[in-house]
Swiss-Prot record:
Bias-annotated ranges (Basic residues): 53-62
A Pfam family per the record: Ribosomal_S21
Source organism of the structure: Brucella anthropi (strain ATCC 49188 / DSM 6882 / CCUG 24695 / JCM 21032 / LMG 3331 / NBRC 15819 / NCTC 12168 / Alc 37)
Protein name: Small ribosomal subunit protein bS21
Family to which this protein belongs: Belongs to the bacterial ribosomal protein bS21 family.
Length: 75
């Protein structure tokens, strides 16, 4: 991963690097690899994440179709 340092502005380059790493999911991966995760725990975690994603998608679809309201005062 590369970040350009312009005009010796290291702080700006560090912020850009952190943003890229966050977008790529590197911090999350480092956290997950910090300790061993049993295969059964991994399956359970992935299944829970899939359920969470499906619920979020269903909620967004329902909001888009007008079945449920969004945030209060959003309209």
């Amino acid at each position: 991963m590369q970040v350009l340092v312009r005009d010796n502005n290291v702080d700006q380059a560090l912020r850009a690097l952190k943003k890229k790493m966050q977008r790529e999911g590197i911090f999350r991966e480092m956290k997950m690899r910090g300790h061993y995760e049993k295969p059964s725990e991994k399956r359970a975690r992935e299944k829970a994440e899939a359920v969470r994603r499906a619920r979020k998608l269903a909620r967004k679809r329902a909001q888009r179709e007008g079945l449920i309201g969004g945030r209060p005062g959003a309209r």
